[in-house]
C-alpha cells in the first residue's frame, strides 16, 4: 500500500461470488479497499498495515480437504477482523469454536434478532432482514465470544469478541437484500476500524501519479490508445504524471465504430496536446481474419496482431521501456484468478506474447468501470469520452458473428451509429450502461417495396449494470425501439429484420462473442 493511502480495509478472497461487492461497498464509503488472495501471510498483511481485515464468504466447508484457508496468525496482528459467512466459520474453526453442516441449508432472505447492543449493530433495528447463503453453520462460538444475533435456522447468526475486535456474521451484508447491510459495514469500517473516510478519486490520482513517476523515472512509456474509456483515462492519467515521456499509438484496425478514428485524433492529439501516432492497419487485420469464424480464435488473432503491429511501430521508436494498458478489475476477474473460472480471454489480459519487450503499467487494474468513469471526470476528460459506450479490444470483430467481411463490418458500423444517435436523441445515454448492434451470421426472408428480400438480421443489445459483472436487459420504450428498427431497415443496406436481445447476464454475457 502506497504511503499516500493512510487507511485501507483488506478483503481476503475465499471464492464468494459477492467478493467484489465488499470492496465496492467500502470504497463507496470513501475508504480505500483491496481484494487479495486468501494465501497472503500474516507478515505480508502486517506490512500492508490495513485498518481492518474482512474474511469473505466462499463455497467451501472448513472441514473439506483442500478448502481455502488463511494464515491463522492474522488473529495475532491486533487488527480488527470481520468474518462473513465462510469467513465467520473459518474464524470459529481457528479460534476453538465448532462448525457443523446445517440440518437445513439456508439460501435467501432471513429474519434475525439482535441481542443487546453489539458494535456491528450500533443504532440499527433489533429485528431486520438479511441475506443468507450457507450450508454449514457455527454451532458453538469460540471461548469469550458473545452471540450477537439469532435467526430461526441459525442460532449463531452473528458473534463478537469486542476486546479483540473480532466479529463474524453468517449472512452477507454486502448484498443489497440485507436490509441494513451497508450500515453494518459502516459500523465495522468507521466504528470498529476508526477509518476517516477521506479517500476519493482525487486521492487516487495523486497516488497513481506518484507510483507512475516512481516506477518510470526518466524512461519512456508507450500507450495503446483506442479511444475507449479505459485507454483514454490511462493515457490522460499517465500524461498528467509524466508529460512528454508518454507516446500513444492509435491502431486503426478497421474494426472501429463510425467516426471513431477521426474523433480519437482530434480529442487527444489536438485537445490534450498528446503525442499520438496513428497506424492504418486495416488490411493487415482483415487479411489475418479471412476464413476465421470461431470467436475465441478471432479474439486471439486480433489481440496478437495488435501486439505485433504495436511491436513494429515501437521498434521505430527509441528507448521505450514501459507499456501502459487499461486493464480493469473486472478484466482480471473474468480472465480467471485462483478462485474464479475463465469466462472469456480478455484483450488486455490474455493476448500478450511471452517475449514482450516491455514492462507493464496498469494503473486502473484495481478499479471497476463506474470508478474509471468517475476518475475520467476528475481528470477533466470530456463527457462524450467518459460516458462513451464500453467497446471491446477486438472491436466490431466480435460483433460480426462468424467470418468477417468489409460488407458485414459496414452493416454493423452503420446500424450501431443509428442506435447510438437515437438513444442520444431520446436522452437515454445515462440510463443504459451499454448498447450496441450485432450481426448474427443468418439471413431471413422479407418483403421490401413489393419485392422478396433475403437479407441480414441485426440484433440490438442494451443492458443496465454498475460494473459489468452482472447486467439486466434495458427496458427501452417501445416507441424508441420502433424508431431505431425503422431507421436501420430503411437506411442500412442488406438488412430486413431487427431483433432485441432480452437476456440478462448471467446466463448470457453482454457481448455475443
Curated annotation (Swiss-Prot):
MF term (GO), any: ATP binding
Keyword Heme on entry: no
GO terms for cellular component: cytosol
PROSITE patterns: GATASE_TYPE_1, GMPS_ATP_PPASE
Catalytic residues (UniProt): 85, 172, 174
Ranges where the GMPS ATP-PPase domain occurs: 199-388
Domain of life: Bacteria
Residues covered by the Glutamine amidotransferase type-1 domain: 8-198
Binding residues annotated for ATP, in chain numbering: 226-232
Reactions catalysed, as given in the entry: XMP + L-glutamine + ATP + H2O = GMP + L-glutamate + AMP + diphosphate + 2 H(+)
Record key words, sorted: ATP-binding, Glutamine amidotransferase, GMP biosynthesis, Ligase, Nucleotide-binding, Purine biosynthesis
EC number annotated for this UniProt entry: 6.3.5.2
Assembly and binders: Homodimer.
Function: Catalyzes the synthesis of GMP from XMP.
Record's protein name: GMP synthase [glutamine-hydrolyzing]
Organism: Bacillus pumilus (strain SAFR-032)
Amino acid at each position: 500500500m502506497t504511503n499516500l493511502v493512510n487507511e485501507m480495509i483488506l478483503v481476503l478472497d475465499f471464492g464468494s461470488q459477492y467478493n467484489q461487492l465488499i470492496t465496492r461497498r467500502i470504497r463507496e464509503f470513501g475508504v480505500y479497499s483491496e481484494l487479495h488472495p486468501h494465501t497472503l501471510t500474516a507478515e505480508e498483511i502486517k506490512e500492508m498495515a490495513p485498518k481492518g481485515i474482512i474474511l469473505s464468504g466462499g463455497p467451501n466447508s472448513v472441514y473439506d480437504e483442500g478448502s481455502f484457508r488463511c494464515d491463522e496468525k492474522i488473529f495475532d496482528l491486533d487488527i480488527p477482523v470481520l468474518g462473513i459467512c465462510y469467513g465467520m466459520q473459518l474464524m470459529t474453526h481457528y479460534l476453538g469454536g465448532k462448525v457443523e453442516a446445517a440440518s437445513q441449508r439456508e439460501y435467501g432472505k432471513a429474519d434475525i434478532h439482535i441481542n443487546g447492543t453489539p458494535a456491528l449493530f450500533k443504532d440499527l433495528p433489533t429485528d431486520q432482514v438479511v441475506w443468507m447463503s450457507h450450508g454449514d453453520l457455527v454451532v458453538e462460538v469460540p471461548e469469550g465470544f458473545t452471540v450477537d444475533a439469532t435467526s430461526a435456522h441459525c442460532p449463531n447468526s452473528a458473534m463478537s469478541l469486542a476486546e479483540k475486535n473480532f466479529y463474524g456474521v453468517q449472512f452477507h451484508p454486502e448484498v443489497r437484500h440485507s436490509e441494513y447491510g451497508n450500515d453494518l459495514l459502516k459500523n465495522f469500517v468507521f466504528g470498529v476500524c476508526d477509518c476517516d473516510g477521506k479517500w476519493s478519486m482525487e486521492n487516487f490520482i495523486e497516488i497513481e501519479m506518484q507510483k507512475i513517476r516512481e516506477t518510470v523515472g526518466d524512461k519512456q512509456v508507450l500507450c495503446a490508445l483506442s479511444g475507449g474509456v479505459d485507454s483514454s483515462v490511462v493515457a490522460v492519467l499517465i500524461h498528467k504524471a509524466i508529460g512528454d515521456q508518454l507516446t500513444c499509438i492509435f491502431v486503426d484496425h478497421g474494426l472501429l465504430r463510425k467516426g471513431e478514428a477521426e474523433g480519437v485524433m482530434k480529442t487527444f492529439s489536438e485537445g490534450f496536446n498528446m503525442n499520438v501516432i496513428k497506424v492504418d492497419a486495416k488490411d493487415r487485420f482483415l487479411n489475418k481474419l479471412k476464413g476465421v469464424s470461431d470467436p475465441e480464435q478471432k479474439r486471439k488473432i486480433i489481440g496478437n496482431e495488435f501486439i505485433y503491429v504495436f511491436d513494429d511501430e515501437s521498434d521505430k521508436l527509441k528507448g521505450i521501456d514501459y507499456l501502459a494498458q487499461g486493464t480493469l478489475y473486472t478484466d482480471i476477474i473474468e480472465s480467471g484468478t485462483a478462485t474464479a473460472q475463465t469466462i472469456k480471454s480478455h484483450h488486455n489480459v490474455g493476448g500478450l506474447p511471452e517475449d514482450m519487450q516491455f514492462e507493464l503499467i496498469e494503473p486502473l487494474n484495481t478499479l471497476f468501470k463506474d470508478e474509471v468513469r468517475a476518475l475520467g471526470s476528475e481528470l477533466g476528460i470530456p463527457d462524450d469520452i467518459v460516458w462513451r459506450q464500453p467497446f471491446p479490444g477486438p472491436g466490431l470483430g466480435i460483433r460480426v458473428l462468424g467470418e468477417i467481411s468489409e460488407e458485414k463490418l459496414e452493416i454493423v458500423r452503420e446500424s450501431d451509429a443509428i442506435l447510438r444517435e437515437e438513444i442520444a436523441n431520446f436522452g437515454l445515454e445515462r440510463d443504459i450502461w451499454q448498447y450496441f448492434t450485432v450481426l448474427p451470421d443468418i439471413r431471413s426472408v422479407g418483403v421490401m417495396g413489393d419485392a422478396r428480400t433475403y437479407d441480414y438480421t441485426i440484433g440490438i443489445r442494451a443492458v443496465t449494470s454498475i460494473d459489468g459483472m452482472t447486467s439486466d436487459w434495458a427496458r427501452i420504450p417501445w416507441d424508441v425501439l420502433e424508431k431505431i428498427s425503422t431507421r436501420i431497415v430503411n437506411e442500412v443496406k442488406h438488412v430486413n429484420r431487427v431483433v432485441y436481445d432480452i437476456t440478462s447476464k448471467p446466463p448470457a454475457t453482454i457481448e455475443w462473442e
